[in-house]
């Protein structure tokens, strides 16, 4: 059975792509009585507030017609930011060599949170080089959340 995030991705991805943006990912989180639906979009050269506003209007229109969410919800549209979330295997492959943090669904060695350098993607296995702990492999389906760690060069 598809998750709400997957259903929404299928529903809106073509529209967002036709507008010239990449739909990086969809997150749904309950906060009190409301559901927050967060869309991450990107494009060459970066995303502006006007881009987010344009996408929000289009997606709101789709949601009004299709009514895919039964709860009250807030829609947020933003750029992926410096701590970019990774949603697909293609995202991981694109950022090999970067530092990241992952949160696992099922703990590995009694840990859910891991931080390290992404060294490779092989099929559905993600490899991280963990400082002072060597390389570890993680099954993509066990990764609940992953974000790049921003690098600031001064």
UniProtKB/Swiss-Prot annotation:
CDD domains to which the protein is assigned, alphabetical: YlxS_C (cd01734)
GO BP of this protein: ribosomal small subunit assembly; translation
Keyword annotations from UniProtKB, A to Z: Cytoplasm, Ribosome biogenesis
SUPFAM superfamilies: YhbC-like, C-terminal domain, YhbC-like, N-terminal domain
Gene3D superfamilies, A to Z: Ribosome maturation factor RimP, C-terminal domain, RimP-like superfamily, N-terminal
GO cellular component: cytosol
Compartments reported by the entry: Cytoplasm
Protein purpose: Required for maturation of 30S ribosomal subunits.
Alphabetical list of NCBIfam families matching this protein: PRK00092.1-1 (NF000927)
PANTHER family in UniProt: RIBOSOME MATURATION FACTOR RIMP
Family the UniProt entry places it in: Belongs to the RimP family.
Protein's name according to its UniProt entry: Ribosome maturation factor RimP
Originating species: Haemophilus ducreyi (strain 35000HP / ATCC 700724)
Annotated gene: rimP
């Amino acid at each position: 059975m598809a998750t709400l995030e997957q259903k929404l991705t299928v529903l809106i991805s073509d529209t967002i792509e036709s507008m010239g943006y990449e739909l990086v990912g969809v997150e749904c989180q309950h906060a009190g009585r409301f559901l927050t639906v967060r869309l991450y979009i990107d494009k060459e050269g970066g995303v502006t507030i006007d881009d987010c506003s344009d996408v929000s209007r289009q997606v709101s229109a789709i949601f009004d017609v299709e009514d895919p969410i039964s709860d009250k919800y807030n829609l947020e549209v933003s750029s992926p930011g410096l701590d970019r979330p990774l949603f697909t295997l293609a995202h991981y492959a694109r950022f090999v060599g970067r530092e990241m943090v992952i949160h696992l669904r099922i703990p590995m060695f009694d840990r859910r949170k891991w931080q390290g350098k992404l060294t490779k993607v092989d099929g559905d296995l993600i490899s991280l080089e963990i400082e002072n702990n060597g390389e570890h492999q993680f099954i993509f389906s066990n990764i609940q959340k992953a974000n790049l760690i921003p690098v600031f060069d001064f």
